[in-house]
């Protein structure tokens, strides 16, 4: 199985003492896929707190070990359609989460996230590495 790793999983891995279940799961991945949206979210979070070492680690990790999936027209279209339908049904979803869900859908990946509730209405496969 292949996974699109959500921002909160990358954030957990960068902690001094990450959750043991997440670490074990993450260490077993042959390929680490994440969305370009995750890159933006990580850079934003680390830059805002001026965490230079973690930013350097993430940059190196991204270049050496990860496959970053770009947002293209198909992903944008699917995201907009799903987010629009969810909004019309009274369900609020962020653009970032919608684009991440669309990226998982487009590439046929399971979305690994702690926040499964945020993605449950997209009809994509989900896994929470924080659970056993």
What are these regions (language model features)?
Residues 2-3, 20-106, 110, 120-124, ...:
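PIN-domain endoribonuclease scaffold, especially VapC-family toxins
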